[in-house]
UniProtKB/Swiss-Prot annotation:
UniProt signal peptide: 1-28
Complex formation: The Tol-Pal system is composed of five core proteins: the inner membrane proteins TolA, TolQ and TolR, the periplasmic protein TolB and the outer membrane protein Pal. They form a network linking the inner and outer membranes and the peptidoglycan layer.
Name the UniProt record assigns to this protein: Tol-Pal system protein TolB
Entry superkingdom: Bacteria
PANTHER family per UniProt: PROTEIN TOLB, PROTEIN TOLB HOMOLOG
Length: 436
């Protein structure tokens, strides 16, 4: 078979390459249709990657954990494996894998290059068709070992579902530590699985609602360091920050526009009314988008930037509204019982996630962009703040049920809810786009 090479991405100025070894035959059997509702998880066997001592097993463990956490895959316990893979480049004994109902098989290897880089490669096999589906290799420095595993998991996810994965991403959030009445809150960033936590602020001031820019290099957030809530821009890698305007009153809930050129937020005036404004980050000019005597807040752009979803209590209690990006055509779309908050548009453009408080419960749900088809994915005590994975298939939010908030993810079926491990309490998550 002919193979080809093309660039995949750059990590810390280290170019990684992707080599597709053998294309999937058109008649291969393994596939997951993630658009048909509830999907039975696909049984998949993921062997330890050969070589690299403990690193091969670690990469296998990370790939396994990523795929399992998605809810679409059911990794088979290694104790059930019949064949012990010794040469990951050779075709496996497919019958041995069919016996344990492994519909897909992942083999791989890790080695150290002469220049000190890690070389990791994998092969994905369709055991019932008896064919290789894909195979790729990656090079990285030691600092990016975990990223290589996430990239491999993304490649497998995409090959078997036809959609982009979301494992090579980061989450920015509020790390909370200390006693409840003296809680220290710090900006923090981590991999989507809870690893590689790094703190972006020192905890001397209260910080809230961090949000990623589309280029993944900046975040907006709120800080009370001046005594009043103000919106800041922070460069993640350099730590450089700047104040986004010095508005009278208080500013809340900042988010970037999809092109990264604007920040949309709500401003609370002395009269107690909160309205929505957009600021052009180049000219620093602001445009008022709502002008009501109510509380309008929590704005979020649609993926194409043409519309904005927000909440308003102009009808008596907080409901979800949609308007044009210029403030035109403000239309209520939610009509259910309860109080709605924190709406956020899916990266796919098809759904809006929200928090809903009703009957003493806090619910995380989704609805279509016209308000129809409302579905509740999770219910509990004091949970809120959904954020979308970049492929629009999973949500993350925070739940306060044992003395402090923790992060939780849930897929669109509502059946696959997963805790996200953090060393301390954690709130206000925001999911990054896929890294590059």
């Amino acid at each position: 078979m002919r193979s080809f090479l093309k660039p995949l991405l750059t990590i810390a100025a280290m170019a990684l390459g992707m080599t597709a070894v053998i294309p999937m035959p058109a008649w291969a059997l393994v596939e997951l249709n993630v658009n048909k509702g509830n999907v039975e998880p696909l049984p998949i066997a993921i062997t330890d990657f050969q070589g690299g001592d403990a690193l091969g097993a670690q990469i296998s463990q990370i790939v396994t954990a990523d795929l399992k956490r998605s809810g679409l895959f059911a990794p088979i316990d290694k104790s059930a494996f019949i064949e012990k893979i010794s040469n990951p480049d050779a075709a496996p004994r497919f019958d041995d894998w069919k016996v344990i109902n492994a519909q897909a098989l992942v083999t791989g290897s890790v080695s150290k290059e002469a220049d000190g880089r890690i070389r990791a490669q994998y092969r994905l096999w369709d055991t019932f068709a008896g064919q290789q589906m894909s195979g790729e290799q990656f090079f990285a420095n030691d600092a990016n070992q975990r990223r290589v595993a996430h990239i491999i998991a993304d490649a497998i996810y995409e090959r078997l579902t036809g959609e982009k994965g979301y494992f090579d991403t980061r989450v920015v959030f509020i790390d909370e530590s200390g006693a409840k009445n003296a809680r220290k809150k710090r900006l923090a960033i981590m991999d989507q699985d809870g690893a590689n936590v790094r703190y972006l602020s020192d905890g001397r001031s209260i910080v809230l609602t961090p949000r990623f820019s589309p280029n993944r290099q900046e975040i907006t957030y709120m800080s009370y360091e001046s005594g009043q809530p103000r919106v800041y821009l922070l460069q993640i890698e350099t730590g450089q920050r700047e104040l986004v305007g010095n508005f009278p009153g208080m500013t809340f809930a900042p988010r970037f526009s999809p092109d990264g050129q604007k920040v949309i937020m709500s401003l609370l005036r002395d009269d107690g009314n909160s309205n929505i404004f957009a600021m052009d980050l180049r000219s620093r000019s602001t445009t008022r988008l709502t002008n009501s005597t109510a509380i309008d807040t929590s704005p979020s752009y649609s993926p194409d930037g043409s519309k904005v979803v927000f909440t308003s209590d102009r009808g008596g209690r907080a409901q979800i509204y949609v308007m044009g990006a210029d403030g035109s055509g403000q239309t209520r779309i939610s009509f259910g019982d309860g109080v709605y908050s924190t709406p956020v548009w899916s990266p796919r453009g098809d759904l809006i996630a929200f928090t809903k408080q009703t009957g003493g419960e806090f619910q995380i749900g989704v609805m279509k962009t016209d308000g129809s088809g409302e579905r509740i994915l999770s219910s509990g005590f004091q949970q809120e703040g959904p954020t979308w994975a970049p492929n629009g298939r999973v949500l993350m939010f925070f739940r306060d049920s044992n003395g402090g908030p923790k992060l939780v993810s849930v897929d669109l079926t509502g059946r696959n809810e997963q805790p996200i491990p953090t060393a301390n309490f954690a709130s206000d998550p925001a999911w990054s786009p896929l890294l590059e």
